[in-house]
Amino acid sequence: MANTDRPALPHKRAVPPSRADSGPRRRRTKLLDAVAGFGVTLGSMFKKTVTEEYPERPGPVAARYHGRHQLNRYPDGLEKCIGCELCAWACPADAIYVEGADNTEEERFSPGERYGRVYQINYLRCIGCGLCIEACPTRALTMTYDYELADDNRADLIYEKDRLLAPLLPEMAAPPHPRTPGATDKDYYLGNVTAEGLRGVRESQTTGDSR
């Protein structure tokens, strides 16, 4: 039998919306919110654009930017790399692989005793730190401003020597070829060798001709 002594719970009546939340005032508020949202768009339309037209117009890079590596040449075309492997030892990411070989008088690629026969840089590992540049004793390895290294094939991101060597200038001869007559590997290192020949020899010849 049901207990009829319990007091009945008060009935909750739904609170009708106030007249302030409906009608013209509410519609005016919604309209102002929409206009405020478009105000941000309209205000940005007349500002200077920050979009860069890449890749049609590549943006500038910093003066000391660490981009793709380059194996440099001497002015006569011989390679600066001597295959010492110091760059590979200095690399913290183990991204460089070098195999050195001996030069001969019949087949000379660099002024010294050895040259880099195999040179690879794995750009899947390279972190662009530049420690390899600091370790190079002949300034053979530098970093360019080229930053477009993305590819859809992992194998193509392992750069071989032919892709790293600096292009031959018109006055250079493609190695292998003999050293400049009268020049030693020290003359090459000190920058005394030019595309025309050994600087000291050329200057003395010019002085003798003038006499």
From Swiss-Prot:
Its main location: membrane. Its EC number is 7.1.1.-. SUPFAM superfamilies: 4Fe-4S ferredoxins. GO terms for biological process: aerobic respiration. Its cofactor is [4Fe-4S] cluster. NDH-1 shuttles electrons from NADH, via FMN and iron-sulfur (Fe-S) centers, to quinones in the respiratory chain. The immediate electron acceptor for the enzyme in this species is believed to be menaquinone. Couples the redox reaction to proton translocation (for every two electrons transferred, four hydrogen ions are translocated across the cytoplasmic membrane), and thus conserves the redox energy in a proton gradient. This is NADH-quinone oxidoreductase subunit I. It comes from Mycobacterium tuberculosis (strain ATCC 25618 / H37Rv).
